[in-house]
């Protein structure tokens, strides 16, 4: 790995490479189908269609449950966490993106501090070192960045590949039979993916799938398996193949924790660039929407994508262009192919007596572009 590559250079190269390449039971049901018809491992050909959004009425299969709140605050986060916490016990890992130095869009630290103090006092935030050079590619630099960004003020972050790596099996994988993750990931009994939903230079969008698939893969081996593959180039994998490799990495972690896992996506400060871009991230244009939570990873990410697509044209165009140009919607279809969850769901509006709504109703009244919320 070229340790000298900078974060800014990473974002630029990622974009260039892509341009050149121009409820529980849901997942179990799908997994049973995959068990009957396993993904072929000899024909390593990426799927297609990652640039095409599939409307809700064109999807089939069972429905999961996704909770939704417009309350973008610590109180809103705690309220929605209560809806998905039932199976989170023992030693809990909270996987979130702690960001590059001074990253402007990461989840507000006071929200996470309140969640941990009131709901998860024995939990740890977990992270891994990065594949690219910057503020987090070594444990020493990573810890300095954690101080800079305010995480060290209230918790100790477990950098899970600090003490080595471990291999987790990838059920029904096309690209992998196993994935390399930070060894300390195995020290936890349950897992909460607390994700800042936003765009991504290579992934198109970063939801729970990206947070886990890239964020739990260790910096030296796992991330290289995803990004480089057999190409011989540091950033040689992109578009549908990248989405599939990332998703298989996620599958390794999700399968390891079984039903002891939940997913929360925060749709706030949604730059087209990931928090790995730090201060070089493009300005936020897409307006804030709210928070979703589910025990179904596909349904959680799909609901966020649906909410973005339900926005007015001028509000969504930048983020939608990023998603479609990177063929990122293959993340969703491949999670379904892998038996990881449902792309259909009941969206429960916890702000209004648990009324079942759709994405259009969730974003009703949102127009224009992003306005800072003061957090």
Residue ranges and their predicted role:
Residues 2-5, 9-21, 27-375:
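N-terminal and secondary-structure boundary signal
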């Amino acid at each position: 790995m070229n340790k000298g590559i900078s974060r800014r250079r990473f974002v630029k190269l990622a974009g260039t490479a892509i341009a050149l390449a121009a409820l529980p039971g849901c997942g179990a049901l799908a997994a049973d189908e995959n068990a009957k018809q396993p993904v072929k491992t000899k024909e390593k050909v990426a799927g297609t269609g990652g640039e095409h959004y599939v409307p809700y009425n064109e999807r089939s299969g069972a429905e999961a449950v996704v909770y939704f709140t417009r309350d973008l605050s610590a109180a809103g986060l705690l309220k929605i966490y209560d809806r998905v916490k039932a199976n989170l016990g023992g030693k809990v890992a909270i996987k979130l993106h702690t960001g590059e130095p001074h990253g402007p869009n990461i989840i507000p630290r006071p929200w996470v501090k309140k969640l941990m103090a009131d709901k998860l006092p024995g939990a740890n935030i977990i992270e891994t070192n990065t594949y690219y050079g910057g503020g987090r590619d070594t444990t020493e630099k990573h810890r300095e960045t954690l101080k800079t960004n305010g995480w060290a003020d209230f918790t100790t972050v477990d950098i899970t590949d600090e003490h080595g790596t471990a291999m987790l099996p990838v059920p029904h994988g096309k690209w992998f039979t196993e994935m390399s993750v930070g060894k300390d990931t195995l020290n936890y009994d349950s897992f909460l993916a607390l994700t800042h939903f936003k765009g991504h230079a290579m992934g198109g969008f970063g939801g729970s799938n990206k947070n886990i698939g890239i964020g739990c893969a260790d910096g030296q081996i796992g991330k290289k398996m995803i990004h480089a593959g057999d190409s011989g180039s540091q950033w040689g994998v992109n578009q549908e193949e990248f989405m599939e490799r990332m998703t298989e990495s996620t599958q390794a972690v999700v399968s390891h924790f079984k039903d002891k896992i939940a997913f929360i996506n925060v749709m706030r400060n949604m730059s087209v660039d990931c928090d790995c871009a730090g201060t070089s991230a493009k300005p936020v244009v897409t307006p804030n929407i709210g928070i979703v939570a589910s025990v179904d990873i596909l349904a959680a990410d799909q609901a966020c994508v649906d909410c973005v697509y339900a926005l007015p044209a001028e509000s969504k165009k930048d983020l939608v262009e990023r998603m479609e140009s990177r063929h990122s919607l293959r993340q969703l279809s491949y999670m379904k192919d892998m038996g990881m969850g449902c792309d259909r769901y009941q969206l429960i509006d916890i702000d209004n007596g648990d009324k079942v709504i759709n994405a259009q109703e969730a974003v009703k009244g949102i127009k224009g572009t992003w306005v800072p919320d003061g957090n």
